């Protein structure tokens, strides 16, 4: 999250992509109309192909856009809350970072019941989430005023552990496909760090994975091969990095301020990007499916 505003809900105009063979890879197109909603952030796809995002007309609201193009308010977080990053576990439960209330919520996909997983007053504002295969959560926690940040681990019992402090503005976060590495970026400092994940989920051996000379970062996600897709806030692109930090390609996303992304679609090869300037979703097709999508397939 770089900036937020909450505008009027726009009219959704959507074309669902079903096959890579009929489409050009790496070419973004509008997935919703401009002005769909202000404050758009935190996209995630469920196993049925619906796209979820926060800020649907109100900071408490989470939107669901179904494969047939219908947009609805899926659920509202409690009073005083504001959602940001969304993730799903392998059983289909949704987790949402609540950056104003210093909480992380779990939402039942059937009953839509909102359950508090953790409330940690020491958090600045939990921003984005990553989830390991065993359900361990990791949360970035920036302090935008001071350009600093923290990093948290939430174990499967719901206990929060501060894994790192005195970092830069921690933002995008992701676990590698083999579960051995955690990536976290610093938006203002333009660095991506990587940690080793130990057997208990704790982190060690922090080192620089990649640095850029310009523009900021926001959300990021891995594909099944461990390539890291990173939003370049201010540049209007998503950059694809290999597991060795090589720049493989950069995709224009039709607006200057991409805030986050996720993989979905029928084959896991559609990337959905929340673009904050035009307040809309855009999408593009890729050659390999996303990590979370592959977990859905394995869990069926």
Question: How does the language model describe each region?
Answer:
Residues 22-37, 206:
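A short helix->beta-strand "capping" segment at the edge of beta-propeller domains
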Residues 30, 72-76, 115-119, 162-165, ...:
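Beta-propeller fold detector
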Residues 34-51, 78-94, 98, 103, ...:
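Beta-rich, blade/repeat-based domains predominating
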Residues 53-72:
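Beta-propeller domains
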Residues 59, 101, 147-148, 189, ...:
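A detector of repeated loop/turn-to-beta-strand junctions in beta-rich toroidal repeat architectures
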Residues 61-63, 103-105, 150-152, 191-193, ...:
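A short loop-to-beta-strand structural motif that recurs across blades of beta-propeller domains
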Residues 65-70, 108-112, 154-158, 197-200, ...:
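Short loop/turn segments that connect beta-strands within beta-propeller blades
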Residues 260-300:
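Blade-level signature of beta-propeller repeat domains, shared across WD40, Kelch, NHL, RCC1
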């Amino acid at each position: 999250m770089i900036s937020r505003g909450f505008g009027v809900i726009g009219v959704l105009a959507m074309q669902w992509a079903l096959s890579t063979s009929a489409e050009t890879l790496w070419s973004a197109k509008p997935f919703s109309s401009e002005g769909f909603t202000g404050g758009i952030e935190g996209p995630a796809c469920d196993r049925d192909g619906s796209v979820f995002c926060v800020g649907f007309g109100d900071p408490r609201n989470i939107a669901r856009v179904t494969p047939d193009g219908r947009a609805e308010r899926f659920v509202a977080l409690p009073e005083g809350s504001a959602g940001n990053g969304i993730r799903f576990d392998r059983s289909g439960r949704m987790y949402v970072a609540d950056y104003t209330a210093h909480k992380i919520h779990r939402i039942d996909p059937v009953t839509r019941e909102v359950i508090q997983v953790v409330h940690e007053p020491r958090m600045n504002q939990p921003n984005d989430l990553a989830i390991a295969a065993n359900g361990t959560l990791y949360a970035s926690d920036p302090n935008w005023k001071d350009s600093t940040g923290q990093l948290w681990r939430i174990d499967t019992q719901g206990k929060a552990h501060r894994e790192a402090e005195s970092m830069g503005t921690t933002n995008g976060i992701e676990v590698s496909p083999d579960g051995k590495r955690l990536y976290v970026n610093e938006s203002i400092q333009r660095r991506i760090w990587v940690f080793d994940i130990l057997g208990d989920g704790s982190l060690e051996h922090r080192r620089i994975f990649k640095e850029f000379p310009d523009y900021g970062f926001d959300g990021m996600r891995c594909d099944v091969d461990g390539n890291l897709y990173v939003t370049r806030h201010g540049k209007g692109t998503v950059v694809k990095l290999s597991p060795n930090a090589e720049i493989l390609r950069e995709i224009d996303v039709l607006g200057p301020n991409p805030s986050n992304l996720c993989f979905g679609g029928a084959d896991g090869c559609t990337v959905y990007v929340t673009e904050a300037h035009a307040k809309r979703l855009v999408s593009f097709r890729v050659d390999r499916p996303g990590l979370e999508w592959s977990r859905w397939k394995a869990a069926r």
